[in-house]
Design a protein with these regions (language model features):
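Active-site hotspot residues in diverse enzymes, especially metal/ion-binding acidic/histidine motifs
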Residues: 1-272
Length: 272
């Protein structure tokens, strides 16, 4: 609880910098609006599946894989912050503001691999759009929402089949590249949907453990680029404010939480 409170304080501090840049650029902050069908009452895991399907429908996403989830959520008015975290993979928060609607924030762990970041983003989105009832475990419901949001049931069944005695590692790697999720998340999803049974699930996880995929640094094959799900909007706004001479280099570096030298190096990379 203490770590979560400290993390929330850091997130609020970073959010204030984010909103400052928007104000300096005289931009109207994109406000979070609940999807039309939310909040979804979740009395069992099927309701979590339905919630994910409804959010995709409300946002016009169809059943296609989502290429960049952090970018999509920022377009929807959620501020995505990437911080160095220890014990926590992520959290969602609502920060009240004077004279404006509350800002919605999702914090993700900077050092996580991209597939994990994507799942955590979808999990935290789940917390924002579902309303568990009847003793349903909220974490499990958010997890199920995340799996359904990133790997729609109909698409996965069409790709894999409805009932399988086993799935090859090669097949899982191909599906991982298609959906942008970890092999382990895919295997859990196949079990949740009844595509594989508990015995097949256990056999696969034994192979994952033997290959070292179950422990840090989680070196699965065909892992996505680490920066793919790093939020980019705040940094872009800082560069824009600098280019428009709204702020100087020292202020831009301060807002980004880096040294002027590091800022210069980043600007050189952007220009290259």
């Amino acid at each position: 609880a203490r770590e979560e409170a400290a993390l929330q304080a850091r997130a609020i501090h970073m959010l204030e910098r984010y909103l400052t840049v928007e104000d300096l650029l005289q931009m109207r902050s994109v406000e979070w609006e609940q999807p039309r069908s939310a909040p979804h009452p979740v009395a069992d895991m099927r309701d979590a599946e339905d919630a994910a399907r409804s959010v995709r429908e409300d946002w016009g996403l169809g059943n296609d894989p989502i290429p960049q989830l952090a970018e999509l959520l920022e377009e929807r008015g959620i501020k995505i912050l990437s911080l160095d975290l220890d014990e926590i993979d992520g959290l969602a928060a609502k920060v009240r503001r004077k004279d404006r609607g509350a800002a919605r924030v999702i914090v993700i762990k900077r050092s996580s691999w991209s597939e994990r970041k994507r799942f955590n983003l979808a999990h935290e989105l789940g917390h924002m759009v579902i309303a568990p009832s009847g003793g349903v475990d909220e974490e499990k419901a958010a997890h199920r929402f995340a799996g359904a949001f990133l790997m729609p049931a109909d698409v996965l069944r069409a790709e894999v089949g409805v009932n399988r005695s086993s799935i090859s590692i090669g097949e899982l790697v191909a599906l991982k590249k298609r959906f942008g999720v970890s092999i382990q998340a895919l295997t859990y999803r196949c079990k949740d949907l009844g595509i594989i049974n508990q015995a097949a699930f256990g056999r696969l996880f034994k192979i994952f453990a033997e290959r070292g995929w179950r422990t840090a640094p989680f070196e699965e094959p065909e892992t996505m680029q680490p920066e793919l799900e790093e939020p980019k909007r705040f940094e872009r706004l800082c560069y824009r404010a600098l280019a428009e001479r709204v702020i100087g280099e020292a202020r831009a570096a301060e807002l980004l939480g880096i040294s002027v030298r590091e800022l210069d190096a980043r600007l050189d990379q952007v220009a290259a």
